[in-house]
Structures are given as C-alpha cells and as structure tokens.
Amino acid sequence: LADGLSALALERHALPLLDATLPLIPNPCSLIPVVQNARVAIADQIGHLLHAQITVLLIGERPGLSSPDSLGCYITWAPRPGRTDAERNCISNIRGPEGLSYTEAAHRIAHYIAEAQRLNTSGIALKDPDPTLTLPISARNPL
C-alpha cells in the first residue's frame, strides 16, 4: 500500500478494495507493507527484497479536478529493480461508485494475478479480462 500522490485515495478505498479482492485470491499475501511518499517502482524494490513471485501495489493516483481520491493498482510479475511500465498491468480510477467499483477492480486484479501465474509474465503480454467493459454513461466525465 502506498499513498503515492493521494493519501486520501488510500484512506478511502484501500480497505474496501482489499475486502473485495482477498477472497478471490487462492493464496493471499501474508505481508502488506505500507509506504509513504512512494511511487509505483517501490513495488519492484519491495518484491525483489522479499523474493515475491508477484506484487500488487495499491497507490493513490495523481489527483484531478473531479477525482481527488482515485486509487490505482499495479501488478508486476517477478518484481525487480528496473522493471518498466510495459511490464506492469494497471487498473486505475478505483473509487467505488464514482469510478471503477471495488467488485470490478477486485475481479480484474484476480484475473491479472491468475494470468500472470499461468503465463509467468505481466504487462502488455496479458490481455484485459473484459475489453468491452466501460463505465456507465452516468459515471463518465465528458470533456
């Protein structure tokens, strides 16, 4: 868990997302580090030091005018220093009813974990669980 650029996002959304996600993962983690002032790559360092097979980082995203509390999730197979963004899967705008729901985000996280384990990779090599999934019109913010 990392506050990233929005501690408010972590405060509001991390626990509900964990509650929705952990039951979907066959062997959930036994250690959840909490990092202040972190950026996405911190998961590579932590995962490498812990000899983790995979990391799932929940991090506060850069606040926008309409979403000061958006949570992001980054999933990386075989974390180590030097991983690139192309080697991670990102799920963004996790905000309950105002963005991606906890349930949908949890299912996407579980999908990416299962696929990463099956294929021994993450990032652009993995496909989205449902490429047709979009937010309802009422949840979209028109430009």
Locations of the language-model features?
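Short glycine-rich or small-residue beta-strand-to-loop segments that form or flank ligand, phosphate
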Residues: 1-9, 56-58
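C-terminal functional extensions of proteins
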Residues: 61-143
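Glycine-rich phosphate/diphosphate-binding loop of Rossmann-like nucleotide-binding domains
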Residues: 7-28
